[in-house]
């Protein structure tokens, strides 16, 4: 793949960035897929822009709106235009408080033609379509069926792509609850039909039920909702009309999404993991794609001539490519180490607790956990930090012991990550974040965190049927998922070359996992150099 340094977006190109471009130019042109692992600090976003501008027109896909905003901040003067979901744009057909996710054009396409010139959402989409670099997020890309083919498709933070696709395509149906939503009067035949599936039903029976259920109840309800929108006097713009429209469009989007997912499922039900679970008086049919490969291929074939996967944590190229259904014969893999000094961010392997599921009520293990955390935080009386708990149960255990210490900010059922993060960055006190879900996407640079504690290695739950099935098929995939999550979490508190922090890993399982990963040669050297074992 040819990459022209002339298109580099900054005045100065770093030596390592120049080297990466030279290596990219050595890749045979017939390779459609490029996997580029760039350690923290290299500046992979600038490389994505360089490749996109050289290619001609490109999509750049990120995991979050925050990362999109960073792309805009850095590259909006380089031909990059960002595109987000409807809820980010005001709807001028309604009042100044409503956004485009509530717009009547969702159910009435003919309205779109009349307001397209004035609609902030469609105007932004038109700008993005005309731009050289169309920057968006995974959710928008996966839910948009009208995007045109470009020369290059860049997946940033590509280690998340499997989770993004699986989350997007997973189907959850509660037949009786759904039936009550879509029918004003539920007949005896309706009830009998919706209760014919049980936890003992076969895959074929479930697949047949879902297909018929979709055509019999979901599709007619979608048409009914569109009819309800058409009956509203939109021009009145009263609070009653706007409230009704908000309710209808939310329900319409929900059912259209469900119908589209079922249509995807109907084409190849054998690719899915089937589950039926009781939920009170109802039950849940959960259908999860076992692998993202088929869905990913429909997007890559439709949207780009070449595809670039970028991440700091691809780690195992063969396992990663296999999990996406991509042949190594049509791929190229390049890896470059982080420029950060490992001595500034040591990781202390304490190996002092075993917090496996069977030990979560083991008094000795819990006492050891509490004492170790208490000792560590007292070494940093004036510093902020973060504790990665590993799961909600451990978060609750720590909450029970430290809830009266005002330093600790807990992610518990009623308090979201964003709330405690905002409290953390605005507080003058040496606060400590405690969460099981701040492994990535959180910037704790400089004094926002000088230490972090990893209580338990972030293995995916084997209680999830799909995870268990994939692990039984290939345990290396399971280990890879853990290492991607762990390395990401260990990077939350050192965000620049001169930044520094200390990380403490408490999990006794780390020794074995680290030995096996080193043997496989999948860990970045910079990460290995950070490890200090006692």
Q: What do these predicted ranges mean?
A:
Residues 2-9, 15-25, 29-39, 77-111, ...:
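Conserved coupling segment at the C-terminus of the helicase ATP-binding
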Residues 44:
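Conserved lysine of the Walker
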Residues 47-50, 54-93, 392:
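Conserved Walker A/P-loop ATP-binding site and its immediately adjacent core
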Residues 84-89, 138-140, 389-393, 409-422, ...:
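Conserved helicase motor
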Residues 115, 121-132, 142-152, 297-301:
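Short basic/glycine-enriched coil/helix segment immediately N-terminal to the Walker B
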Residues 127-142, 426-440:
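Conserved two-lobed SF2 helicase motor
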Residues 351-364, 413-513:
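Conserved RecA-like P-loop NTPase helicase motor core
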């Amino acid at each position: 793949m040819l990459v022209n340094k002339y298109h580099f977006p900054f005045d100065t190109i770093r030596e390592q960035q120049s080297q990466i471009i030279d290596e990219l130019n050595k890749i045979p042109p017939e390779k459609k897929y490029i996997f580029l692992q760039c350690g923290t600090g290299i500046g992979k976003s600038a490389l994505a822009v360089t490749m996109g501008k050289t290619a001609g027109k490109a999509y750049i896909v990120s995991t979050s709106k925050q990362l999109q905003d960073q792309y805009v901040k850095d590259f909006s003067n380089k031909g990059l235009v960002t595109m987000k979901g409807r809820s980010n744009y005001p709807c001028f057909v309604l009042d100044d408080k409503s956004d485009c996710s509530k717009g009547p054009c969702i159910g009435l396409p003919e309205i779109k033609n009349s307001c397209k010139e004035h609609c902030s959402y469609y105007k932004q989409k038109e700008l993005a379509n005309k731009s050289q670099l169309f920057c968006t997020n995974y959710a928008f890309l996966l839910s948009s069926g009208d995007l045109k083919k470009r020369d290059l498709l860049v997946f940033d933070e590509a280690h998340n792509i499997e989770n993004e696709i699986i989350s997007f395509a997973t189907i959850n149906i509660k037949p009786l609850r759904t039936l009550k939503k879509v029918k004003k009067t539920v007949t005896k035949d309706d009830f009998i039909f919706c209760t014919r599936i049980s936890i003992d039903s076969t895959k074929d029976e479930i697949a047949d039920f879902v297909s018929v259920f979709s055509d019999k109840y979901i599709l007619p309800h979608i048409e009914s909702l569109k009819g309800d929108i058409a009956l509203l006097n939109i021009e009145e713009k009263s609070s009653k009309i706007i409230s009704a429209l908000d309710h209808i469009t939310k329900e319409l989007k929900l059912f259209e999404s469900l119908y589209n997912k079922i249509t995807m499922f109907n084409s190849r039900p054998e690719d899915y993991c089937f589950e039926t679970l009781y939920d009170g008086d109802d039950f849940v049919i959960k259908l999860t794609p076992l692998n993202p490969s088929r869905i990913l291929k429909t997007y890559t074939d439709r949207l780009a001539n070449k595809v670039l996967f970028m991440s700091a944590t691809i780690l195992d190229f063969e396992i990663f490519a296999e999990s996406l259904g991509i042949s190594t014969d049509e791929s190229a893999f390049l890896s470059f180490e982080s420029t950060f000094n490992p001595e500034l961010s040591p990781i202390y392997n304490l190996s002092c607790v075993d917090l496996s599921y069977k030990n979560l009520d083991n008094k000795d293990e819990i006492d050891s956990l509490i004492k170790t955390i208490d000792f560590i935080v007292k070494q940093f009386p004036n510093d902020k930090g973060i504790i990665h708990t590993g799961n909600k149960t451990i978060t609750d255990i720590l909450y029970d012991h430290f809830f009266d210490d005002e330093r600790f900010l807990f992610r518990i059922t009623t308090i979201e990550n964003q709330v405690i993060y905002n409290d953390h960055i605005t507080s003058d006190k040496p606060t400590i974040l405690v969460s099981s879900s701040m492994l990535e996407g959180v910037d704790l640079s400089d004094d926002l965190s000088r230490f972090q504690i990893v209580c338990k290695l972030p293995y995916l739950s084997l209680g999830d049927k799909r995870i268990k099935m994939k692990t039984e098929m290939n345990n290396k995939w399971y280990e890879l998922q853990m290492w991607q999550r762990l390395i990401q979490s260990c990077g939350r508190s050192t965000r620049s070359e001169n930044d520094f922090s200390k990380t403490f890993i408490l999990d006794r399982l780390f020794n074995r996992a680290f030995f096996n990963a080193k043997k496989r040669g999948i860990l970045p050297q910079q990460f290995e150099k950070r490890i200090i074992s006692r």
